[in-house]
Amino acid sequence: MPDINAEELLEKAWDEFCNDYDKRVGEYSESVTSRAEAEAAHWILWNEHDLMVQLGRFFYAQLARNSLSKIEMHIDVKLKYSSFKGYKFRPRLKDLRKELGKVPEVDLIIAQEDSPERFLLCAEAKCYHYSGDRYQRTAKGDIEKDLKRLVTIRDLGIAERVVFILFDDYYWIQNEDIESVAENACKEHNITLLKHNSKVKLERWK
C-alpha cells in the first residue's frame, strides 16, 4: 500500500465541505425573514457528529479521486482496551486511560483497513451554534480538554497524526474570539487546526 497522508486528504475534504456548506446555507437563508430566525436555525449541522458525517462524504470522495482504497473512517469511537485486541498500540490504551482519567471517546479516526498498526489520524471537533459556556463548562475549557486528548494519543503512538477541527456559523467565534484560543493552543502543541467561521447565515443582517 502506498504511503497515505491522511491529514492532507482531510484538509482537502475540509475545504470542499466548507465551500459546499456555505453554498447550501446561502440558499437556505433566502427564505429567512429576520436575524433572530437565522441565529436560531441549525441547517445541515446540529452537532459534532453531523459535522463528521458531512465531512466524511468529502473525505471518501477524495479517496476515490486519488484511487485509494482500504482506508476506513470511524466516528465517535471509545478507545477501550477491550475493543482493540491484536492492535500493536493496545497496551498504550491503559496508559491513555491513566493519563486522561477515563476512557476517551474521539470524534474521528482514519485507519488502514485490517491493519494492526497505529491509526493514520485522530481528530477532535467542536461545532458551535451558540455559547459553549454553561454550568461549570466553558468553550475554552472544552477545547483544552480535546487538545490534551489529542496530544496524549499522539505522544503514546496510538495515532500517526492528530487534527483539531473548529466550526462556527458566525455566533460563538465571532463574539468571544475562541478562534484565537484554538489557534494559539494548536500552535503550542504542534497540532493541525482546520477551522471555518461561516458568515453566510447572518450575512444579510450585518
Where are these regions (language model features)?
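Active-site ExK catalytic segment of metal-dependent nucleases
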Residues: 107-111, 119-131, 135
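Nucleic-acid nuclease catalytic cores
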Residues: 151-180
